[in-house]
Design a protein with these regions (language model features):
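Active-site- and interface-proximal helix/loop "cap" or "latch" segments in soluble metabolic
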Residues: 54-199
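N-terminal amphipathic/basic-hydrophobic helices that include classical n-h-c signal peptides
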Residues: 1-20
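N-terminal intrinsically disordered, cationic/polar leader segments
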Residues: 24-49, 53-64, 77
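Short N-terminal helix-initiation segments at or just after the protein's N-terminus
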Residues: 18-32, 156-163
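Intrinsically disordered, low-complexity segments enriched in small/polar residues
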Residues: 3-6, 38, 171, 180
Length: 199
């Protein structure tokens, strides 16, 4: 049971169900939509492709970069595809800017090749910033790249597991549910319940 001065006492499960739904919003008008999708693919050659797609559009006409964009017309429509091996090393990268507000935007595509040979995992965001940070890259492509690693982890079997059975999966200790001292780890990975890294 969880109790509050507003709701009285309710079962914990009920609180979880309540937290999963947003309340009915106030009367409002839509202004902007950003759609981001990630998809993982197993290739026949034993490698994996992870694709990311970002699309921005507004619900009213607006002008930027000397061009007027109509409602629903994407002014950002960008794709990134990386090919990785089992060790999550990037073997190839491809970028497409199907829509962009300024003619200079595609100039950031060639430097993306600098990520070939990098590994998804610890330090990935630092690697992105080293190669594509600031004026060397694109804010929106960096956003896709930052999260493409998560899609890879979800897509590739064993990506989050250390081959050493005496070490916990890499996602343990990264969020509330996977707290080493919490009930989920105690149930699912009792071996690593209360685990502390050795220094």
């Amino acid at each position: 049971m969880i109790c509050s001065r507003y709701d009285g006492c309710i079962p914990s499960l009920s609180l979880l169900l309540i937290a999963a739904m947003l309340s009915t919003p106030a009367s409002r008008n839509p202004l902007h939509t950003r759609e981001i999708t990630f998809q993982g693919y197993a290739r026949e050659d034993g490698l994996w492709d992870i694709e990311a797609h970002l699309r921005d559009f507004k619900f009213h006409p607006f002008t930027t970069g000397g061009k007027t964009w109509e409602p629903g017309q994407a002014f950002h429509d960008m794709w990134v595809r990386i090919t990785v091996n089992t060790e999550l090393v990037i073997l190839a990268i491809e970028v497409s800017m199907d829509s962009h507000p300024h003619p200079e935007c595609p100039q950031v595509i060639p430097p993306m090749d600098g990520l070939i040979g990098a590994r998804l995992g610890k330090g990935w965001r630092k690697t992105i910033n080293e190669h594509l940070g600031g004026i060397k890259g694109c804010t929106h492509l960096r956003e896709l790249l930052s999260n493409i690693a998560t899609a890879a982890f979800q897509s590739i079997p064993g990506a989050l597991f250390d081959p050493d059975d005496n070490k916990p999966p890499l996602y343990l200790g990264t969020c509330k549910s996977w707290d080493f001292d919490g009930p989920v780890v105690m149930r699912v990975y009792p071996k690593f319940y209360k685990w502390k890294p050795t220094i």
